[in-house]
Structures are given as C-alpha cells and as structure tokens.
C-alpha cells in the first residue's frame, strides 16, 4: 500500500462499540449528548432541538479539519494517515 495515502472515514458513533453499527443524524446526537435537554431548560422541561443542525455541521467540520491536518502532516513527513471520526 502507498504509505502516503490518507484514508478517512466518518460515522455516527465510531468504528467500534455497541452503537457502531447504528446510523446517526443531528437529532440523535442532540438527544444523546444532552444538548436537547439543556436547550429545553433542564431535566424537568421538554427537550428542544437546536435549529440549523449543529451536530451535523460540527461533525462535518471536525471531519474536514482532520483531513486538512493529515494533509499538513503528509506535507511535512511524506506519510499518510488513517483517520476515524464520529459525529457524536
């Protein structure tokens, strides 16, 4: 295999663990992270989803930043990397 290849994968819950085979989307991440409860005013209130899909966006930003960082690393060292990121 070419040692300078950058292989990147992104999933909802990571490549291993009990949730690894499940898909994910913004509402799931907000619910599981507690963001929907916090936005709704706390545990004694109804959860409220944050508009504009922040978990979808931040997951994509983290994935893109990981790739850019790997490109910088390859520019300096000539070596690629295997990246695994998750939405949550």
Labelled PLM ranges:
Residues 1-88:
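Active-site-adjacent "lid/gating" segments in soluble enzymes
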